[in-house]
Amino acid sequence: MSRAGHRIRTERLGAPLAAAVLLAGGLSAWALTGASAQAAPASVDAQDDFNGDGYADLVIGAPNATVSDKAKAGYVAITYGSASGLSTANKKIVSRSTSGIPGSATAGERFGLTFTKGDLDGDGYGDLVIAGGPGGSVVLWGSASGLTGGTNLAGYGQAPQAGDFDGDGKTDLALFAHSTVAGDDPPSAKAALWKGPISRTGTPAAVLNILDKSEWWGYDEDDASCATGGGCEEDGDSISGPIVNGHVGDVNGDGKDDIVQWVYTGDGTWGNRLLIGGASGFTKSWVPGEGASSDVSGTGVGDVNGDGFDDVVVGGDGWDSKVRVAYGSASGLSDANTKSFDQSLPGLYGAEEEGDGLGTAISVDDVNGDGYADIALGIPGEDFSGLTDAGSFALVPGSASGFTGTGSQVFHQNTPGVPGVAESGDKFGATTALLDVNGDGHRDIAVASTTENGDNGAVWLLRGTSTGLTTDSALAFGPDDLSAPATKAQFGTSLR
C-alpha cells in the first residue's frame, strides 16, 4: 500500500495557522496570531508525526551550514506541528555536533542533504533517518517528547528511503552507500533492503539484497539474468549511483511501496530510476526522465486521479520545460499513459521559457481534501516585474481525469499575504513539501528559497483549505529564527 493509502482522513474544524511575518525586503521578524478553539486533529501518517500528537512535523535540511567551524558540515531543523501550525519556538536542531549523534562535524559532509521519515520500530511514532555521506546515516527515534537518541547506520550514507517495500505492513528501509561521480560510467555502491521492524540498536528483522534475483546478471545464458544459473558478475547487493534523492509510492497498486530515485546515469547525465517493491527485493521498471537531463529535475509521487494507483510527476529538464505525469496502473507506468503540460496550462501564467525551472521541485498530495492528490510545482527561475530568477510556485489540483488546470494557483513573494518582497535571484520555490502541520485534514505547503538573504535560505508555510492554498496567516522563517547556524547555510535545500 502506498503512503497515501495509510492515511485515515477525518473532518474537523479548520483554524488559522497562527503565524505572520513582518518584513520589508528581507526576513527580519515574525509574529504569532491567535488560534481559534479546535477539535481533535485529523489522523496523519505516523511517518510525519514524531511526537504522536496528531500533527505533521516539518524537517528542513541546511547542508551547507558551517557547524563547529566546519564549512558545509550541515544540519537539519525539525519544527513540530500543532493546532496553530508551526512555531519557531518548538523545534530541534540536529548536526554531527549534537549530543547523542554519532560522529563529529566534518567539513564538506553536507549532513542533512537528504533524509526520510518512517515508523521503523512500529511504536506509532515517526522516526527520522538522516543521510550523512561517508559517515553513514543516523536514525533519530520518535517519542511522546519528539525525536531522541541517535543510532548510526554505518556504511549507508546516501538517500535512504523508508516504506513498506514487501507489503507485510511493517516499515522497511532501503539503504545506499555513499558514492561520487568519478568518470563517465555510474559507479556501483553497496546497498541493502532492511526489513522492518528495525530496533533502536539498528538491527533489522532481516537483511535482503536490494535487487531481486531477476535483476542479477552474468555471462552465462548470453548475458541474461543469472537468477537460475551461475556465473553472476553482479548480484543484488549493490546498485549504480550516486543517488541524489528518492520518493516512495505504490505505482502498481500491489500493496508494496516503490521508489523513484534521481541517479547518475553516465556521460554527465542524471535521470530517474524506478524500483518496484517485492518480497525478495526490487525490480527495475520504466519511469519518465530516464537519463534525459544534465539538470536537476523535480519528482513527486501521489494519486493525482484517485484511481488507487500512485502516479509519478516529473518536472521539466534541460531539454524542455514540460511537466510529465505518468499515471499508475496494475501494470505500472508506461509512456502511453503519460501526459504533459507546461505554463500554458489553464490557471498558470507566463510563457514557456528556458530557465524557468518549471517543476524543479515537485510535491504531490491532497491539499483540498477531495481525495485527489494535487501537484505543487516549484518554478524558481521565473522572471516577473523586471526581476530575474525571483521564483514562484504553483498548485495544480488533481481530479478524476488527472490534471486539468482548473483551480490552479500561483504564488510568489509579491503575492498579497505572502511574507517578504520578491527580489532577483531569490529563486523562491527551489524546494517544496506538502504535509498537514495543523491537523485540519488539508495538506499545507512548505516552500523554500535557498538563496534568500545571501544564501542563508528561508522557508515559507501556506495553509491548505477546502478550496486550495491560502495566504491567510502565512509564515516565513529563516535559520536565525531557530537560533541555528545561518551564514550560507542554504536553509531549505531539502524539505519533508
Write out the residue ranges for each language-model feature:
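A detector of repeated loop/turn-to-beta-strand junctions in beta-rich toroidal repeat architectures
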Residues: 71-75, 88, 127, 134-136, ...
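Mobile, glycine-rich extracellular loop/lid and propeptide segments
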Residues: 110-119, 125-142, 159-165, 174-177, ...
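Acidic/hydrophobic-patterned starts of short beta strands in beta-sheet-rich repeat architectures
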Residues: 52-61, 122-131, 167-176, 253-262, ...
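Long, internal scaffold/assembly segments composed of regular secondary structure
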Residues: 242, 246, 251-317, 321-329
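Blade-edge motifs of beta-propeller repeat domains
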Residues: 2-43, 80-110, 141-161, 195-241, ...
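Hydrophobic strand positions within the blades of repeat-based beta-sheet folds
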Residues: 58-60, 76-79, 94, 111, ...
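Beta-propeller blade termini
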Residues: 40-55, 61, 112-120, 157-167, ...
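Short glycine/acidic-enriched loop and turn motifs that connect beta-strands
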Residues: 64-69, 134-135, 179-184, 264-268, ...
